[in-house]
């Protein structure tokens, strides 16, 4: 059974390399992340687990044309050794001097004029620009437009879309109207025209809403865009069950706060359309 799993892992790595070769990508990075930098991620976002077979909550995989590595911390050394055993993936123990760091590995393995790929939706700007600066001496380009693991993950679970529900103000402390007013005051002080939100816990707090899109975390997949006059909440609209008591309460609460609901998938294109705004 274990041998079969390891063979499947090596097959997946081979499939990924085929796509990398087609696109001219020399190394592909797969973090443990969703679109919101959540500490824990839903099943849809477990690309690193799918690719490597390692199911710890922290770790980053890098695949090149002839090497495959997983970086994780001391909490997971024993587990990772067991789950990677028999595959071609090497465990790089973070914090131990005999193992290169992720940065050191990329500096060494990427060729001059090479290309590093990753899904830019799950890599934050700090890491992305850091990698760009790290590799600029080798004139390495970044391709952040491809979810290559998603392309080979034919049985990928659907993105979670559990019902959203409203938290009573007696538990929330302040109404959404009050919280938006406080936020807009802070925006004025900082001369910000637009406030973008991507962290799920912060969005749930601001709008006094809760969900169950990540196990044991009362959050829902969402973004928010706030101006002095408007507030937009981006969610999967199917998560607001308007024909149920719970859904009607959500709609009423958002209407009271003059919050407009938009489709989750529209957020990135709306942000791309922003021009000359101070965020």
Segments the model singles out, each with a brief description of its role:
Residues 2-110, 123, 127-273:
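N-terminal accessory/capping or targeting/presequence segment of soluble
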Residues 114-121, 279:
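Acidic beta-strand-to-loop metal/phosphate-binding motif
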